Amino acid sequence: MAETSGPQSSHISSSSAGDKGSGCAVRDLLYWRDVKQSGMVFGGTMVLLLSLAAFSIISVISYLVLSLLSVTISFRVYKSVLQAVQKTEEGHPFKPLLEKDIALSSDSFQKGLSSSLAHVNHALKSIVRLFLVEDLVDSLKLALLMWLMTYIGAVFNGITLLILGVLLAFTTPLVYEKYKVQIDHYVSLVHSQVKSITEKIQAKLPGALKKKSE
């Protein structure tokens, strides 16, 4: 058993390190550490979502593929004509990219799969816990959230909510970073009120329904 624990622990450590690295990359992206990179991701995401709001997903994918092919085919023809006029033999303009190894390694695939599987298992465990009412208060919170979502869904469609989500994701961190002290103060007040109300509700519940002490 001691021999097998070493590779497993190292694999888990590498997965955790990968998760931390990806988390830092997302954080830097949302906090606009690199304005050019964040702007490209934000702009590209918004263009895609706005396109999906106006056209069907099949049309959007078709237009994207046609746009990409228009660029690559035009560049390929341009370089071929240029080589014919200048009588040069530079070869295929995309040869370095065609010869580049873009295959996904088994190690990278296994790391990504292990990381994704851990998140999926955690989500499944939380879903089962909520739907089977392990904690009544948490299940009631989910019911209240879903009830509110019915009203939100009646006003906004899925694409509109995604657009609003992207806007909030790329603007809220900047606002929070600028007004961190004030926001933390009000969040603390709200958290205290919610905690107080939750404790009052739990105190009135029968013993079998109260949250199990950890």
UniProtKB/Swiss-Prot annotation:
| Lipid bilayer topology | Multi-pass membrane protein
Q: Does the keyword Isomerase apply?
A: no
* Major location (coarse): endoplasmic reticulum
- InterPro entries noted in UniProt: Reticulon (IPR003388), RTN1-4 (IPR046964)
Instruction: Enumerate the residue ranges of region (Disordered).
Output: 1-22
Which cellular components does GO assign to this protein? endoplasmic reticulum; endoplasmic reticulum membrane; Golgi apparatus; Golgi membrane; neuron projection; postsynaptic density
Transmembrane ranges, per UniProt, are 46-66, 150-170
Reticulon domain location is: 26-214
**Any Pfam family matching the protein:** Reticulon
Q: Where in the cell is it found?
A: Endoplasmic reticulum membrane; Golgi apparatus membrane
Q: Would the keyword Membrane be found if you checked this record's keyword annotation?
A: yes
On the tree of life, the source organism's domain of life is Eukaryota
Keyword entries, A-Z: Endoplasmic reticulum, ER-Golgi transport, Golgi apparatus, Membrane, Transmembrane, Transmembrane helix, Transport
Provide the GO biological process annotations.
Answer: brain development; endoplasmic reticulum tubular network formation; negative regulation of amyloid-beta formation; neuron differentiation; vesicle-mediated transport
The record's note on quaternary structure and interaction partners says:
Homodimer.
Record's function text: May be involved in membrane trafficking in the early secretory pathway.
Name of this protein: Reticulon-3-B
Give the organism the record lists: Xenopus laevis
